[in-house]
């Protein structure tokens, strides 16, 4: 059964007020800006935003008044530094920020994907990340007196130094988003999706979520997806809806399709320093455009063409036969 719907239908159905939404799981690339803009257009409220490095998408959703909480490792403009709306919200108390690291966020999502309440780590020990943070709990290792075997040698004949299980650990609480939105290169109508490049925590975020929306640069026949199973990182049975949206990740890059629009990130930084400027920016780039096609039309054909991939780098052909 086809899961292909419009962006308007997908957001209306899958993102009611008050839910937690994971966005921008692939770090600086393939951030689902088109989906985020539809969330803004539909004036969703009370959202919790989840993501490692969301770049400026979180800042836009915050500026529109859609979010009340952020669970992230970093929020800002990767190119320029501060995200003014996020900063204003935290300083004024209208936005709650829960601080995780990239790795601890990955652990939280992975725990939910595995169906376990937490995963252990040592990486937060000695830092203040876990202080007054409900996502961390100090625990004792049940194997504290066990010495790990050093029989496995490293390449070159050098033995691994003996390791002992540290008694003190941090448990990172599982995190299951109500909705995970991901942008991929291509998918079929059933939601089976090809993706390549930097995954970030894409796979963990999809498997941890209660519902999944896949946004694809193009919808292709199922035969195209099945011809390359190793790129099918999202199986259709996990997906609730799929949307075709060309340039849906702009201004972030999509490997093999278009590059990062650095000028747009600079312009956003320059024109959103105040609340009034941010509202004017949203009016021009979100509220006054009906969909992604209208959004891209504002740039003109030359600007869009400049973003298209010029230097191609193809993978070697793969033989899947036996």
Description of each model-found segment:
Residues 1-322:
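Conserved alpha/beta enzyme-core scaffold
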């Amino acid at each position: 059964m086809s899961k292909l719907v419009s962006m308007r239908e997908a957001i209306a159905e899958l993102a009611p007020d008050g839910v937690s939404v994971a966005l921008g799981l692939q770090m600086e690339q393939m951030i689902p800006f088109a989906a985020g803009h539809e969330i803004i257009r539909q004036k969703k409220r009370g959202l919790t935003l989840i993501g490692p490095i969301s770049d400026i998408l979180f800042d836009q959703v915050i500026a529109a008044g859609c979010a009340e909480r952020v669970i992230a490792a970093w929020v800002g403009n990767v190119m320029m530094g501060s995200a003014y709306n996020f900063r204003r919200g935290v300083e004024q108390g209208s936005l709650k920020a829960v601080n995780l690291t990239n790795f601890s966020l990955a652990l939280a999502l992975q725990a939910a994907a595995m169906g376990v309440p937490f995963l252990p780590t040592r990486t937060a020990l000695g830092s203040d990340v876990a202080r007054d943070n409900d996502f961390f709990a100090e625990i004792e290792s049940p194997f504290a007196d066990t010495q790990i075997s050093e029989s496995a040698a490293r390449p070159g004949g050098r033995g691994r130094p003996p390791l002992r299980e540290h008694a003190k650990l941090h448990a990172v609480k599982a995190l299951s988003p109500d909705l995970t939105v991901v942008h991929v290169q291509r998918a079929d109508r059933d939601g089976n999706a090809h993706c390549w490049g930097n995954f970030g925590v894409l796979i963990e975020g999809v498997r941890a979520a209660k519902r999944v929306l896949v946004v694809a640069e193009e919808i292709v026949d199922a035969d195209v997806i099945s011809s390359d199973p190793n790129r099918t990182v999202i199986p259709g049975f996990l997906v609730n809806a799929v949307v075709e949206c060309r340039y849906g990740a702009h201004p972030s890059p999509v490997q093999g399709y278009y590059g990062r629009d650095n000028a747009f990130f600079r312009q956003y930084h320059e024109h959103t320093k105040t609340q009034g400027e941010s509202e004017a920016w949203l009016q021009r780039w979100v509220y006054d455009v009906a969909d992604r096609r209208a959004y891209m039309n504002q740039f003109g054909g030359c600007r869009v063409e400049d973003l298209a991939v010029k230097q191609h780098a193809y993978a070697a052909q793969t033989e899947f036969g036996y």
